[in-house]
Amino acid sequence: MDTTTSIKMTTLAIQNLFSYVEEENLAAVKVHLDKFKEVDGRSDNGQTPLMLASEQGSLEIVQELIRRGANVNLDDVDCWSALISAAKEGHVEVVKELLENSAYIEHRDMGGWTALTWASYKGRVEVATVLLENGANPNTTGQQYSVYPIIWAAGRGHAEIVKLLLEHGAKVNCSDKYGTTPLIWAARKGHYDCVMHLLENGADVDQEGANSMTALIVAVKGGYTEVVKELLKRNPNVNMTDKDGNTALMIAAKEGYTEIVQDLLDAGTYVNIPDRSGDTVLIGAVRGGHVEIVRALLHKYADIDIRGQENKTALYWAVEKGNATMVRDILQCNPDTETTTKDSETPLIKATKMRSIEVVELLLDKGAKVSAVDKRGDTPLHIAIRGRSRRLAELLLRNPKDGRLLYRPNKAGETPYNIDCSHQKSILTQIFGARHLSPTESDGDMLGYDLYSSALADILSEPTMQPPICVGLYAQWGSGKSFLLKKLEDEMKTFAGQQVEPLFQFSWLVVLLSLLLCGSVALVLGFTVDPKLAIAISLSILALLYVFFVVVYFGSRREGESWNWAWVISTRLARHIGYLELLLKLMFVNPPELPEQTTRALPVRFLFTDYNRLSSVGGETSMAEMIATLSDACEREFGFLATRLFRVFKTEDTQGKKKWKKTCCIPSFVIFLFILGCLIMGMALLAVFKVDGQNQTVNAVLVSMASVVGLALLLNCRTWWQVTDSVLNSQRKRLHSAANKMHKLKSEGFMKVLKNEVELMAKMAKTIDGFTQNQTRLVVIIDGLDSCEQDKVLQMLDTVRVLFSKGPFISIFASDPHIIIKAINQNLNSVLRDSNINGHDYMRNIVHLPVFLNSRGLSSAKKMCAPAPANGETGNSEGWHEELDRKLSQNSLGDQTKFGSKTTLNRRDTYRRRQMQRSVTRQMSFDLTKLLVTEDWFSDISPQTMRRLLNIVSVTGRLLRANQISFNWDRLASWINLTEQWPYRTSWLILYLEETDGIPDQTNLKTIYERISKNIPTTKDVEPLLEIDGDVRSFEVFLSSRTPVLAARDIRTFLPCTVNLDPKLREIIADVRAAREQVNMAGVTYPTLPLQEGRPISMYSQQSSACSPTASFNGPYNPPGVSPQPHSAYFSGMAGPQHPFYNRGSASVVSGTPSILLSSMSTDVICERVKLIDGIDQNLISQYTATIKKANINGRVLSQCNIDELKKEMNMNFGDWQLFRTSVLEMRHVENQVLHEEAPSEQGSITVGHVEPCRHAGAAAQGVAGNTDTSPMYNFNLSFEELSNVGLEEPPRHVNATWMGTTHRTPSMSSLNSQESSNEICKLTDKQQAEYRNAYEDYIASMSQLELGMEKPVPPFVSQLMHSSSEDKKKDGNDQDGRKSVSKRGSTKSGSDNTDYASADAATLDPITEEDEKVDHGSSKSLLGRKTSGDKVSLFQGADLKLKAGGGSRYQKLTSDDEESEESDNAPLLKDGKKPEAKASDGGDRSLTKGKDYLSDKKDSSDSGVRSNESSPNHSLQDEEADLSQSERANLIELDEENSARKRGLPNSLSGLQDPTIARMSICSEDQCSLLASSPEESWPSSKSYNLNRTPSNTTLNNNTNAQQGNHIRQPSDSSNTTSTTTGSDVIINPGTSTTSATTQNENVRVVHLKRGLNPGDPPEILKVSSETVTFGEERESIL
C-alpha cells in the first residue's frame, strides 16, 4: 500500500475525524463519516482512526468504523496494527471485535512482537486467553533477543499467563538469546507462583542462563528463600558456579542469607569451593560480617586456613573487620595464627594496627607470636608503641619473655624502646613502672617534684632576689630529694639560660686587634723580606679583614638558611672578642658597680657544685672538694684565663671608685700602651734600618726604647711570676694541697684557706658580673647530711654558714630535718642548750627558705583548682592584695609563670615575664612587709625572719598559682606566719580538720583551736615538739587578730602548697595518739564544733591516755561538749579517765560511743535525750515527751523500729524530726559499732546472777570493750532499763550517758597514779585550778536542779572527783583520806571498786571553759565521755549517777603506781571480757586486776564504774548479781551521811557542794582526796565510761580493782578474790527491791578496802557504798 501518498492526501477533514475519535464523540464521527466517505485516513505517524479507537478502547467507534469499511489490518509507521494496540492496552471487547472481523492475529510490530507477546508482557490475562483461543502462537519470539511470551510472563510475574501459555503448548525450557529460561527469569525476581507453574511443568533447574547463572543462583542472589527451597526440592546441582566462580552458597554467605545458607548446607553444598579470586565461602561470610553463617560453615568443617586473595585467611579477614566474636569462633577451630598476607602481616599485626584490644587478647590467648614481623620489620610491639597504646603494649608484653622484643630493631633500625623514648609521655614506664626514673626524666614527674623545682628555680633566679640565701629541702630520708636536686638544677639553668647569643659588633677592640695583627704580619715580612712588600701585604690583609667583617656583620642579621654560616661566625667572633675584652678589663679596669636590680634586672646565671662527686659528706676534705667543683664550674663559665688571672689582677679596695686602674696616678693601660708602642716602634725601626752602626740616631732611639721595655719587664717580674703561678696552679690544686697539709694547718688554718678561696671566688664572680652585666649565683648543694656521722653534722652546718654567708651564694640543703635536728641537739654545746636554743632554732636560723616536700599535698591541690573561691575574701576590696590578685590573674601571670617556662620562651617573652614578676614581687614584698610589721604578732620580728617569711610566701604563692588556686596574699602571709611560728599547734589544727568531716569553711581557726587546745600538751617535758612553737599566748592573739581572721577554708586552700610545714609533725601527733590508744583502750573524741554534728568515733577513737595530751583519749578529740583537758601528762605515759564536763552547745548527735546503748534506754531517758537535742523546738518538747511515754517508745523500740512509722507516731514538725531522726540513727550506729567490736563482751561480761539475760545484751557490748584483760568482769549485761530501775525511787538520770561507754574506758589511769604523773599534775596552773573549781560549782548546782527526786544530789562522779593523785595514793594516809572523802560523799561505802572508779574518774577533771560552764538546763558541764552533755549519749539512767545536769562529770581516782604499772601492762580491752575467774587472790593480783580494771575503768574508770556502767550491779553478798543490777539501776549513789561524816577531812561544803555530807569531792576541797580531785590529773578527760554507781571514795584503784574484780564473781561473803581485808560488807539489796522496783533501798555496803599501796600500818578503810554504787568492775576485791 502506498502509505506516503495517503499521508500527503491527509486533509483537514481527516484531522477533524481524529479529533472526534480522540474525544470518543460517536455522533460527530457518524456525522463526519456521513459527510466524508474516507474511513482509513491517516495521521502524521500513519495511524488510522481505527487504530486510535482500538488503543483507546472505544468499542462503539471501532464497530462504527468497521461497519463503514475500515481496514482492520492496516498498520502505522511502527507496524502496529489495531489488534496489537488493543491487546497491549488490554481492551478485550475490542480485540474480540477485531478478531471477528478477520484481523491478522500473528501480525508483528517492528520488534517482532505479536499481540500475544504484548498481552504476556503487559499481563493482560483475558486478552491472552482470547488470543490463545483464537489460535495465537504461544512460542513466537521477538526479533532482537528471541524472547518468548512465556519468558516475559515469567520474568514479570504474570503467573496466570504463564499457566495459560503452558496449557496452550508454550515451551517450558525455551530460552532467550542468552540461554536464560523462564524459570531463571521467574527465580531472578522471586516470582514463586510462576516458578511453581514452571517446575510443575518440568522446567530444567540446572539450565544455565546469562553469566552462567542457574535458577538457584539467581534465587539465592535475590534472597528468595521460598523459591530456593522449592528449587532445592528438585535436586539441582547446588555446586554450579556463575561466571565469577561463585556458587549459590558463596553468594548466600556473602549476602548474609542465613536460612538459605543453612538450606544449601543441608542440601550438601561444598563449603570450600573458592571463587575466581580464591576466596572461599567462609572468607566471603567473614568479609560480610555474618557471624551465624560463619558458625554454620565452621560447623560444616569449612577449611579455615585456605588463603584467599592477597593471601588473606578467614581469620585475617575477621581481624580486619574487627569482629571479635567471629575471631573467637574461628580461633576455636585452631587456625594457623601465623599465616601472612602478601604484605607479611599476621592477624596479630593487623589487630595491633587496628588497635583492637579484645582481638589482640584473643590472638595472644591462642598463642599468636608477638615476634612476627611485617615487610618493614615491625613487630606488633613497634606498632602498638608507635600508636601510643598502653593497653596493647601491656598485652603484648604480658609474657616477660617477649620483653626482649623491645630491643629488636625493624628495617629502619627503630626499636620499640627507642620509639617510646622519643615520645614525651612514655608508655613503657606506665607498664613496667618507672624503670628508668631519673631526675632528668621530663615525663616522669611521678613524685610531684616538677612544681617544687620550678617554683624554687623561679624564686632563686628572680633578679631581685639578694643572695646569699639558704634553702632547706626537707623530706624523709630516702624520699628522693636527690631527684629534686637534679631537677632543680636543670630548671635553674633553663630559667637562667635565656640570654640571646651576642652578634659581632665593631668596636675599638676590633680595630686595635686588626691593626695589631696586620702590624705583626708587616713586622715579620719586614724582617724577612722587603719592608715595602710587608706594608703592602699588611694593608691588603687589613682591607680584606674589614670586608670580611662587614659581610659577617650584615649577613648574621639576615634571615634565611643561606646566611646561617654568617650567623655562626658572627656569634663565635663576638664570643672570643668579648672574652679578650674581659681579660683586658680585668687587667686595666676597675669593675663597675652593678645597678640596683629594681631599676634594671640583669640576667642571672648559675654555677653549681658537683655534689655527685662527694664520696662522703662531712669533714673538711669534702668541703674542699665541694669548693673545688665550684671553681671548676667557674672556669668552665668564665674561661680558663679569666678565672686564673683574676687572682693576680683582682681589684684592691684601695683603688677607689675610678674607672681605670692606676699605677703612680697614671692609668695602667696608658703605661701598657706606651711600652707596647715602644716595642712596636723598635721592631719597626729594626725591620727598616736593620742594625747599622752608622745610623746613630736610630740606634739611640732603639736603645732608649729597649731600655724602657726592659725596665718595664724588670719592674713587673713579680707580676709575671704571679701570672705564671696562677695560670699553672688552679684553685682546685691549691685546695687539694691545703687539704694534704691538714696535719700542719690544723682545722682552723684549713678553714681560713677555704674561706679565702671562697671569698676570692665570690669576688671574682662579682667582678666579672660587673664587666659582663650579669648576675652570677654560686649554688652550693649539700646532699646527704642525714646519712653522715652525727657528730659531723653540726660542724658541716657551721662550715657552710661561715663560708657561704656572704657573697652570691645559694646554699641548698637536702636532708631529713628530723635526723639533722636530732644530730644538732646531740652536738650543741651546753651554753646554747642552757639558753633554750635547740636544733630546730639552729636550723631555722641558718635556713632562709624551708621547703618540705609533700607531693601528696600538691596532688590534692589539683582538686582545688581555679573554681576555688578566693578564700572567701573576694569581696574584701581593702588592700593591695586584691588588686594584685586581679592583676596577676588578668595578666595571666599564672600561666606565664607556670614553672615550666623553659627555653621555649623567646627573648621578648622572657623579658616581659621577668618584668612582670619583678614588679609583682617588688609590690608584694613591699606591701607584705608593711602588712606584717603593722601586725601585733609581728612586733618581735627580725629582718631575718621577715626575709624567711617573704621567701616562703613567694614560693607558696607560685605553687598556688601553678595549681590555679586563687588566693589573697594577706591571708597567705598570715597562714605562712602561723605555720612558721607555731608549726606544732598548727599541725594539731590541720589534723583536726583532716579527721573531722563536715567542718564548714567559715569556721575560724580560733574556734577550732578552742575545741582542741586542751588536748595539746602544754609542757615541753611532756611533748618535746613544743619547743618548736613560739609563745602560746601570741598564738592565741594571732588567731583572733583583726586582719585577716583565718578560717578552715584557708587551711584547705593553702595546705596542699604549703612548703614550710613539716608533714611529719602530723604523723607524729597521730602516732602518739595511736600509741596511747593501745595503752589506754579508751579515747576521747575532739570536741565537735557547735556547727556540726559530732561524728562517731574517729580513727583514733581509742587512744592510750598515756601518750595523748589528754589523760585519756577516746577519740581523736574530745566529745563535742568536752572541754579539752590540760595535757600535762601528754607523753608521760599516764592515763586518766577524761573529765566529763560537757560544753553546752554540742551537736545533737554526740560523737563517740555512748555510755549506754540505745537499746537499754527507758522512755524517760529517751525523753531526756530529746530535750537535750540541740536546736529542737523547746515549746513542743512537752508534746513530744508525752507522745514518747504514751507510745512507750523506749530505747529498744528506737533501735529496731521502722523510721517512717516512727515519724508518723512522733508527729514532729520537719526540723525537729530531722534532728530527732539524726540523733536516733547516730545512736543506732554507735550501738552497732559497739556490739560489733565487742561481741566477745557477752562472754566476758559479768553476768549478774539474778539479772535477766536480756539485760546483758545491751550493756554488755559496751562494757566489754573497755576492760580487756582483767575486766572481763566489767562487761555488764544488764539492760539499761533494768539497771535504771534497780532501786531507783526517782526517774533515772540520763544525764551523762557517755560515761557509760565502758568501751571507751581508758586503761591507763594507772599511769596517772604514778609519781611522775602526779608531779606533772601538780604543774597545772592556778588558773586551771580555778577553772576547775568554778566549773565544778556550776556543775553541782546544775546537778542539784536535775536531781529531781533525789534527796541528796550525790553525783557518782563526785566521788570520782576525789581521785587521789598518784602521790596521794602512794601515801597510804592519802589514799585512805581519799577513800573517806568518797564515802563521805555517799553514806554508802562503795566497794573500793566504786571508789576507784570514782577516783579514777575524778582524776579526769577537765579544765572547764566558760562555755562549758554554761550548761543547758542542767546538762551539766561535765562532759562525760565524749557525748556532749552526756545526755546525748545513752545516759546511764538508773543510777544515782544521774549526774546533775548532764551527768556531772565524774572524777576518777588516779591509780596508784603499782596499779598503774599493772594497768599499763594489762591495758586490757574490755572486750577480752575475761571471766571473773581472774579474781585476784592476792593483793598483787588484785592490784593487777585492778590496774586492768582500772584501765577498763578508764572506760569506766573503776570497776565499780565499770559495773555501774554496764552490768555494774555489785554482786552483793546476798545476790550479788541481783544486787548489782539493782545497784546499777540505782545509779544514784546515796552516801550515808554517817559515811560522809566518817570521811576524814572532807570539808563540809566542798566548793559548790550543797550538802556537806554529800560533800562531793570538789576540786577545791582541801582534803587530800580533794587534792587528788583537783590535781592536774583531774584535767585528764575522764574516759567515756564512768561508773555512775561509783561512790566518791578515794580508795585506791587497787582496792577497787581487786574488790571489784572479786565482786564480779565473788561469793557473797567470800572475800577470796580480795586479799583486801574486807569486813562483811553491808551491801544488801533488800529482797523487796527488785531490779525493776523503782526504788532501791541501798544498803550500805561496808567494805574494808585494803589498799595495795597502804603502808603496812595503815588500817583498812571502811567505806559504805550504796549497793547501787557498787560496781563489779573491780569486784575482784570482794565486798563483804
UniProtKB/Swiss-Prot annotation:
Residue numbers spanned by region Disordered: 1362-1554, 1574-1643
Biased composition (Low complexity): 1574-1602, 1613-1625
Biased composition regions of type Basic and acidic residues, renumbered to the chain: 1365-1380, 1471-1502
Domain of life: Eukaryota
Keywords: ANK repeat, Cytoplasm, Endosome, Membrane, Neurogenesis, Repeat, Transmembrane, Transmembrane helix
UniProt-listed GO biological process terms: nerve growth factor signaling pathway; nervous system development
Coiled-coil features, chain-numbered ranges: none
Chief location of this protein within or outside the cell: membrane
GO cellular component terms attached to this protein's record: late endosome; late endosome membrane
Known partners and oligomeric status: Interacts (via PDZ-binding motif) with pdzrn3b (via PDZ domain 1).
Name under which the protein is recorded: Kinase D-interacting substrate of 220 kDa B
Species of origin: Danio rerio
